């Protein structure tokens, strides 16, 4: 990351985090170690459809040297790791993502533990996080979800995300791709090409 972007990112993080949502729920930037610890604890329970194939695992292990180089290079791009805390400052969820290209932020994964689902935490988190990403300078946000994941799809569609594709992923299954455009010129271009109406 260049110095100007890094400075913009530092200033945006100071401006937006930590932040308290309703009902004493707090969101904050996490270190890699903090984030990984929470994901390791809850990921399999929240995403049981994520399958690990032993043959693929062995193949990736054999290709490990080159994969490590790619992973290291990928980590140099802008990424965000955010943890969600309850009123006792215990982690109850996360959000992560990163640059997909120079205009697009990819919301990679969000998880909220079962006992805190259905409390509008995701909707509040989405609203605030998108303001933050726009402040950094991104033009659009994408994400992918299973078609049965109504708890995420419905809030995003209500917010203004559009369905823009489908990926048949070897690990995750059939994933619906969503896109959100921050600016009306991009949204208008999208609707004029693909929408049921022009705006």
Q: What label would you give each PLM region?
A:
Residues 133-145:
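Conserved GNAT acetyl-CoA-binding A-motif
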Residues 112, 118-131, 158:
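Conserved acetyl-CoA-binding loop-helix of GNAT-fold acetyltransferases
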Residues 36-50, 70-71, 126-129, 133:
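Hydrophobic alpha-helical core bundles mediating ligand binding, dimerization, or RNAP-core interactions
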Residues 1-37, 186-199:
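Conserved N-terminal entry element of GNAT/NAT acetyltransferase domains
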Residues 44-104, 108, 113:
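Acetyl-CoA-dependent GNAT
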């Amino acid at each position: 990351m260049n110095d100007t972007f890094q400075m913009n990112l530092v200033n945006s993080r100071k401006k937006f985090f930590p932040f308290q949502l309703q009902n004493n729920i707090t969101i904050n930037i996490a270190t890699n170690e903090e984030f990984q610890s929470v994901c390791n604890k809850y990921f399999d329970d929240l995403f049981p459809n994520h399958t690990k194939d032993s043959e693929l695992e062995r193949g990736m292990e054999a290709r490990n040297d080159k994969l490590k180089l790619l992973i290291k290079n990928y980590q140099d791009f802008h990424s965000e790791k955010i943890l969600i805390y309850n009123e006792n400052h215990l982690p109850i969820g996360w959000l992560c993502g990163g640059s997909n290209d120079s205009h697009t932020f990819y919301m990679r994964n969000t998880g909220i533990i079962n006992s805190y689902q259905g409390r509008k935490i995701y909707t509040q988190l989405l609203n605030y996080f998108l303001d933050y990403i726009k402040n950094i300078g991104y033009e659009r946000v994408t994400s992918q979800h299973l078609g049965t994941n109504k708890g995420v799809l419905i809030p995003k569609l209500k917010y203004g995300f559009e369905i823009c594709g489908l990926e048949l992923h070897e690990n995750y299954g059939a994933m619906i791709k969503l896109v959100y455009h921050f600016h009306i010129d991009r949204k208008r271009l999208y609707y004029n090409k693909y929408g049921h109406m022009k705006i």
